[in-house]
Regions:
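Glycine-rich phosphate-binding loops of nucleotide-dependent enzymes
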Residues: 2-261
Length: 261
């Protein structure tokens, strides 16, 4: 069920860490993303919810520079005329993709340190404090720090992917479906960690099909459908909106509610 497309005021933040304006992506004659605009404020968690095929991953890929796009992307106060992956990473944009890109033949600790090295280009000693911070967030990773990443469970690999992104101390962390395919216990743990990051002032753009869990942790939310922003507003307000309840929080999402705890 689609949500009615309504024009609503933008996310009002004085100095957004990310501002996307009229972003569009086309595959041939098919427009996968159409004039999408959003903002993420400093220390804010913003979520984008929507069904499969809505264009959520396309949106993140275009912001990151993985896909060619039309529109405007301003990150950390600077306009990126043509976003490029290497430039965005160097400037502090972190992405945890839906398909976790880990090095199975490397230890958990070395995978984490690689995340810091990709941005800061320095040695292990320079990142010891950051490594301890990540281990505090993810005790499981500390317990398994000397194991090969290939031996981890799916949930542990997701924790490692998030931890590796945090090692780079990103100015904005983008999470693409972090709970996808995870067991209920691990899903609750992932969202607990997201809530903790919010308390620590980490800016996050969260793309998530589990609308109920996403709206619980977010400050502001966008509903993306068929490549367009259909609705937006404070997350608590959208969670109470009858149209969102019917489309995303009704009986069809009871399973998601169980996963979110």
């Amino acid at each position: 069920m689609q949500v009615e497309n309504l024009r609503q005021p933008e996310n009002q933040v004085s100095s957004p860490v990310l501002e996307v304006s009229d972003l569009s992506v086309a595959y041939g004659k098919v427009e996968a993303l159409s004039n999408a605009s959003l903002r993420v404020g400093q220390g804010q968690i913003v979520t984008v919810i929507g069904p499969n095929g809505a264009g959520k991953t396309t949106l993140l890929s275009a912001i990151m520079g993985v896909l060619g796009s039309r529109g405007r992307v301003a990150f950390d106060g600077s306009l990126e005329a043509v976003p490029e992956v290497e430039v965005m990473v160097a400037r502090g944009l972190g992405l945890v993709p839906e398909k976790r890109e880990l090095f199975g033949s490397m230890t958990v600790a070395d995978n984490l340190l690689l995340g810091a090295f990709q941005r800061h280009r320095s040695g292990k000693r320079d990142h010891a404090d950051t490594l301890d911070e990540v281990y505090t967030l993810f005790p499981r990773l500390k317990e398994r720090r000397d194991q090969m990443a290939a031996t981890l469970s799916g949930g542990e690999r997701q924790m490692l992917a998030v931890g590796r992104a945090l090692m780079a101390k990103p100015k904005l962390l983008m999470l693409d479906e972090p709970s996808l395919g995870l067991a209920p216990l691990i899903t609750r743990e992932i969202f607990r960690i997201i809530s903790t990051l919010r308390q620590q002032g980490v800016s996050i753009l969260l793309v998530e099909q589990n609308a109920r869990a996403a709206l619980r942790v977010a400050d502001y939310a966008y509903v993306l459908e068929t490549g367009q922003i259909a609705m937006q507003g404070p997350a608590a307000q959208l969670a109470d909106d009858p149209r969102v309840i019917e489309a995303y929080l009704g009986l069809a999402s009871k399973h998601q509610e169980m996963l979110a705890g």
